Amino acid sequence: MDCNCFDPQWPADELLMKYQYISDFFIAVAYFSIPIELVYFVQKSAVFPYRWVLVQFGAFIVLCGATHLINLWTSTAHTRTLAIVMTTAKVLTAVVSCATALMLVHIIPDLLSVKTRELFLKNKAAELDREMGLIRTQEETGRYVRMLTHEIRSTLDRHTILKTTLVELGRTLALEECALWMPTPPGLELQLSYTLRHQNPIGFTVPIQLPVINQVFGTNRAVKISPNSPVARLRPAGKYMPGEVVAVRVPLLHLSNFQINDWPELSTKRYALMVLMLPSGSARQWHVHELELVEVVADQVAVALSHAAILEESMRARDLLMEQNVALDLARREAEMAVRARNDFLAVMNHEMRTPMHAIIALSSLLQETELTPEQRLMVETILKSSNLLATLINDVLDLSRLEDGSLQLDVGTFNLHVLFRKVLNLIKPIASVKNCLSRLTCLQICPEFAIGDEKRLMQILLNVVGNAVKFSKEGSVSISAVAAKSESLSDPRAPEFFPVQSENHFYLRVQVKDTGSGINPQDIPKLFCKFAQNQALATKSSGGTGLGLAISKRFVNLMEGHIWIESEGLGKGSTAIFIVKLGIPGRSNEPKLPFMPRLPANHMQMTFQGLKVLIMDDNGFSRMVTKGLLVHLGCDVTTVSSGDECLRVLTQEHKVVFMDVSIPGIDCYEVAVQIHEKFGKHHNRPLIVALTGNTDRVTKENCMRVGMDGVILKPVSVDKMRSVLSELLEHGVILQS
């Protein structure tokens, strides 16, 4: 009977068949589970690049599993249909297997390259790990550096900086010992100055020329040195297997503007030596980042030491400066006290000396106008001349005193320059004629007629210079030339610091006084401007010295921004005095405002003041008597009082002039003047008020003008001066020049 079945090709063995059946079943289960796992993990992976390969591989496995599953039914008698299914499954499996095999030819190289990339990435990851380790090490080193720098910079004391450095380095690097060797001031040795553990005596020295020291000083890097080197023998006895030792130089920065104690000389090596030791008996070694840390700290210590040294020297200089300031302040106060004492003394002496001088000159001038024998007249004239000379000397002493302490100032105003020179010439001519000396004035026409300056002081300079020329000339001539100097004639090779600058607002007056007198030794010329200087060659002769005249003149010339000098070719060859002063040029708008200089009538010497009622207020009875004698001699009706109250009580409208001493102790004479104004009201109803005083200071004059006085005259006063004062008062109602 045909059942469309295949007979088995060998006898069935039940046991073998049973094993094949079980094996095919598990193979089929395994083949079916593998694609499921592949599908699961492929879905979980979003970046897998071989999805089609997995599909083919999965189909191959599924078909292989299907063939094994079908074999479960083909191991026994089976139908033709099952055989066709089995054949179809194997054919498909063969096709898919070949396709998968062909695909693997292209895939396997990629899979191998993936492995290569994996190894590359692993190497890269390891390299990154090393770099990250270096970065972490650098960050840690930087943190240590910042920490150490902060600790080092937290103070500006050198000793604290160095101790802090050793302590912080020892703590950060776990050192057994850390030491600092400082150069001695001569720079020939290194001295152990600081240690961390204090196990060695401070002050131990080693020569600076040791090879190991030269090796360290020759580089700015930390250098490993032998533990047995002289600078590294800092461990306690009994230690063996010493740890590694490094040394680094610490620059001691050059401080050119400071002289600092304990700092090496500039000619020596300006380094300190820092030695660092790892613990003994350990296998620890110095790492690169630790050496870098040591190098950075050494540089920071160098900067901190320089700052501390500068601060230390600045504080020392400040203390020294404070001491000097205290000493200078004390000296200044003492000098001010001395100046005040001198000024007070001069003021008192001035007032006290002028009072008797007033009596001498006044009485001598009165005697001069009486009938005298020639011998008596000669004696009176000698007394009067000597008294006038003494009064001039008193004025010079006061002027010099005020010039030296800076209290004297120029009284600047507009004046007639030509008139000033003619006045000087008129004053000098009588003296020159007595000595058979011809005096003349030249070149004045090329000077401006009016100028701005201190007329009184310029006249004083001229009188001093011309007076000296006449004084030292027995006969011959004295010539005075004055010009508005040009730039080329202003310089003096002996005074290069004098460098005048021309402008439109001022000019420089150049005055030259040339005489044919005794001349001067060239070596004596610089001494002439000293106080009471004498020409040594002429010191025994009657001419004497220059007194204070030239010394005062030089200071006045300096106040006028000028220069003065003297030239002479030697003894017997005459001399030339030259001075230059700066004067202002009045503007056109100021010309109408030039002060009117009235001329006294030519016959004022013959004027009489018969019946003129005058009141004198002076506490000094002797001075009252002398002043009264002058006025009575001139014909005045004189009343004298000794106090302000008496003055106000006695004073009436009949009195035309009041002379009052403004230096009466216990009386405010300025207040008396104010009360006189109040008593008589309008100006034309009151008497003229004149201060008769021995005080020559500017304050006295300003106070007199402030309270409305009509003039100030200084003691001593002669008959001629009193006559001139009264004439000026009665004609103009004011004294134009004191």
From Swiss-Prot:
A GO BP term here is: negative regulation of ethylene-activated signaling pathway
Localization per record: Endoplasmic reticulum membrane
Q: Which reaction does it catalyse?
A: ATP + protein L-histidine = ADP + protein N-phospho-L-histidine
Against Pfam families, the record matches this protein to: ETR1_N, GAF, HATPase_c, HisKA, Response_reg
Q: InterPro entries, from UniProt?
A: CheY-like_superfamily, ETR, GAF, GAF-like_dom_sf, HATPase_C_sf, His_kinase_dom, HisK_dim/P_dom, HisK_dim/P_sf
Protein name (record):
Ethylene receptor
Domain named GAF is located at 157-305
Q: Which organism is it from?
A: Nicotiana tabacum (Common tobacco)
How does the record describe its quaternary structure?
A: Homodimer; disulfide-linked.
Residues modified as Phosphohistidine are 351
Per its UniProt entry, which superkingdom is the organism in? Eukaryota
The record ties this protein, via Gene3D superfamilies, to: 1.10.287.130, 3.30.450.40, 3.40.50.2300, Histidine kinase-like ATPase, C-terminal domain
> Which residue ranges does UniProt annotate as crossing the membrane?
22-42, 53-73, 91-111
Q: Which residues form the Response regulatory domain?
A: 613-730
- EC class of this enzyme? transferase
Which UniProt keywords are present, listed alphabetically?
ATP-binding, Copper, Disulfide bond, Endoplasmic reticulum, Ethylene signaling pathway, Kinase, Membrane, Metal-binding, Nucleotide-binding, Phosphoprotein, Receptor, Transferase, Transmembrane, Transmembrane helix, Two-component regulatory system
Q: Which cofactor does it need?
A: Cu cation
Listed under GO cellular component are: endoplasmic reticulum; endoplasmic reticulum membrane
Q: In the UniProt record, what gene is named as encoding this protein?
A: ETR1
- Which post-translational modifications are recorded for this protein? Activation probably requires a transfer of a phosphate group between a His in the transmitter domain and an Asp of the receiver domain.
